Amino acid sequence: MKIVDISREPISKTPHNVDARKVYDTEHATAVVITLAPKEALKKHITPVDVFFYVLEETGIVEIGDERAEVGKDHLVESPAKIPHRWINESDQTFKVLVVKVPRPTTGTRLL
């Protein structure tokens, strides 16, 4: 058994310049917890594999392709491979989301 204390994981350097902590990384999948401060957002980007998001705290705005929705705690959002997407925190609260990429990407994310 492996137990991960997310608060002790290092913040990964990403082009989004946000708090992103890798919590799971195998040949089959990778998972990252992203924390967005109030009014913070990810840059629109394309991921080479399918992604699903599970909202851990508060409410955020997700954009996938031409769709936009407000999503709150305990909601899961599917995002197909190669479709532009991003998260936006328009609130005054800290937003936290679990990002799971399956299968584990072999090429990088592309910013738009």
What would you call each of these model-derived segments?
Residues 35-37, 47-62:
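Short, conserved beta-strand element in jelly-roll/cupin
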Residues 33, 43, 52, 67-69:
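Short, surface-exposed secondary-structure edge patches
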Residues 1-30, 77-78, 109-112:
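A short, N-terminal "cap"/entry segment at the start of jelly-roll beta-barrel domains
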Residues 17, 32-47, 81:
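Conserved short histidine dyad/triad with adjacent acidic residue
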Residues 81-106:
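Ligand-binding loop in jelly-roll beta-barrel domains
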Residues 67-81:
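Short acidic-glycine-tyrosine-enriched beta hairpin
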Residues 42-44, 62-63, 79, 85-91:
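Short beta-strand His + acidic residue motifs that chelate non-heme Fe in jelly-roll/DSBH
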Residues 30, 59-61, 68, 84, ...:
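Structural motif
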